[in-house]
Amino acid sequence: MTISSAHPETEPKWWKEATIYQIYPASFKDSNNDGWGDMKGIASKLEYIKELGTDAIWISPFYDSPQDDMGYDIANYEKVWPTYGTNEDCFALIEKTHKLGMKFITDLVINHCSSEHEWFKESRSSKTNPKRDWFFWRPPKGYDAEGKPIPPNNWRSYFGGSAWTFDEKTQEFYLRLFCSTQPDLNWENEDCRKAIYESAVGYWLDHGVDGFRIDVGSLYSKVAGLPDAPVIDENSKWQLSDPFTMNGPRIHEFHQEMNKFIRNRVKDGREIMTVGEMRHATDETKRLYTSASRHELSELFNFSHTDVGTSPKFRQNLIPYELKDWKVALAELFRYVNGTDCWSTIYLENHDQPRSITRFGDDSPKNRVISGKLLSVLLVSLSGTLYVYQGQELGEINFKNWPIEKYEDVEVRNNYDAIKEEHGENSKEMKRFLEAIALISRDHARTPMQWSREEPNAGFSGPNAKPWFYLNESFREGINAEDESKDPNSVLNFWKEALRFRKAHKDITVYGYDFEFIDLDNKKLFSFTKKYDNKTLFAALNFSSDSIDFTIPNNSSSFKLEFGNYPRSEVDASSRTLKPWEGRIYISE
């Protein structure tokens, strides 16, 4: 590969070229029939992940936790949750991952911890405790007519209701942007930061991890004084705190400090990658986070494309959108990198998103497989580090027509309760909320992995176990690893082919630059070009159930059809008509 001086982003790195497979440990594979996935279960399926063509695994939180938010409420950063196994099980998993030639990435949840963490127990014990300032404690703003304490400001929790919880013992509120058992850590306190680095980062670096996915990494720096947020949702007394909590005044300083800690801690020469979850940021802010010369993050996750079609006031309200909106939002993931020393990520699914075929494709029996393959064609053609979430490679779809009682996610439950209290169970607000969660709830991604059509647990647990969460009934319809591995036309086998294509053409698929839309306003066609050295990649993707026409850029005869989601025997490479949900990638040299 030729590194272009005009495109420093093309400097090769393992974490740029890797396809990273995300594992949600509770739902991946249960080895001991207690209904929960575990470390030994993951270890038993590493060969499956390797054979898919992925190069690294990222495991969502496996630390000791009360599990109020599925492990994103950590009580001990240096201990594996016993249900998942022991620390030794985890060390063995890291070793096996490395023996198979893959990297091991773990989740870093350090904006907040669990209220069961010793740090918080000490902090809440008295107003004079040395760790009191490790969290955000504030007196009530006042008391209402019934004598109840009023929260210090109007910030809304991401999970509904106020972002403050009152502590009876010391008669003060503590800040928790998520659920009431997830108190926010005060990064302004240097002793607190040092403890975070040592316990949550240093311990796992010492045990061989290759990188960290940094949970809500834009929230560490809160604006001094914690002022009231502007009112953008007139229907609620609680408002989004983003202007005062996201990408705050010291956020880059904090990430540089943590990055320096990582570089100083690792003595064996391995290069550690970090990927920050940065929900929304301007292009300039993204460049500040990921510029190699600034030593903050390797890359980041942006939510522009997954938030399309949802209200900025409240994500669990759906709003209309067109393909053009999604195209533009998707390009926001990587266009800021062009001609810089920055880097980006490409993804459609994770533990916080629904199934992409339901969300952006067509999950009907007729079009599920072909539209799932189309999304794969799109992903492997875009520049950046590619992430694949467990079950995505099977073409999993959202569960259908589940009552609210079957939902497990604390975000759904808390918002349901808040809307019920504020507007009523039969209100229009509740109707909109229920419509939204059927499409975008996080629970769609969290059902147990579908390994086979074995009743009743799809091979996730033994037949006599009771899984921690309901299974998606689609495992009975052929959406499972065992059936798909035997079917040459399955989504699973297509993903293997797609990842081979991406690796074979990594110069232009992974590192390609100068991305340009073709026919951006087209409501059915997603088409673009990008370049690398003397090569040009042209993609034509039909996001509809109709046949549509397209044109090759400049009608050039130099473009050769290299990849697509219909069998090559069914495709006329000279045709300029795409079948329903057909995607093609052409390359000219």
From Swiss-Prot:
Broadest EC class?
hydrolase
Q: Which SMART domains match?
A: Aamy
Sorted keywords for this record are:
Cytoplasm, Glycosidase, Hydrolase, Maltose metabolism
Task: Cite the position(s) of the site with description Transition state stabilizer.
Answer: D352
Gene Ontology terms for molecular function: alpha-1,4-glucosidase activity; alpha-amylase activity; glucan 1,4-alpha-maltotriohydrolase activity; oligo-1,6-glucosidase activity; sucrose alpha-glucosidase activity
Q: What is its EC number?
A: 3.2.1.10
| Predominant cellular place of this UniProt entry's protein | cytoplasm
Q: Where in the cell is it found?
A: Cytoplasm
Q: Which domain of life is it from?
A: Eukaryota
Question: Which InterPro entries does the record match to this protein?
Answer: Glyco_hydro_13_cat_dom (IPR006047), Glyco_hydro_b (IPR013780), Glycoside_hydrolase_SF (IPR017853), O16G_dom_2 (IPR045857)
Provide the reaction this enzyme catalyses: Hydrolysis of (1->6)-alpha-D-glucosidic linkages in some oligosaccharides produced from starch and glycogen by alpha-amylase, and in isomaltose
The active site of this protein is located at: D215 (nucleophile), E277 (proton donor)
Q: Which GO terms describe its cellular component?
A: cytoplasm
Please provide the Gene Ontology terms (biological process) for this protein: disaccharide catabolic process; maltose catabolic process; sucrose catabolic process
Instruction: Give the residues annotated as coiled coil.
Output: none
Q: What does this protein do?
A: Alpha-glucosidase with broad substrate specificity for alpha-1,4- and alpha-1,6-glucosides. Not required for isomaltose utilization, but overexpression allows the IMA1 null mutant to grow on isomaltose.
Q: Which PANTHER family match?
A: ALPHA-AMYLASE FAMILY MEMBER, NEUTRAL AND BASIC AMINO ACID TRANSPORT PROTEIN RBAT
> Record's family?
Belongs to the glycosyl hydrolase 13 family.
What more is known? Present with 166 molecules/cell in log phase SD medium.
Question: This chain belongs to which protein, by name?
Answer: Oligo-1,6-glucosidase IMA3
What is the scientific name of the source organism?
Saccharomyces cerevisiae (strain ATCC 204508 / S288c) (Baker's yeast)
**What's the encoding gene here?**
IMA3
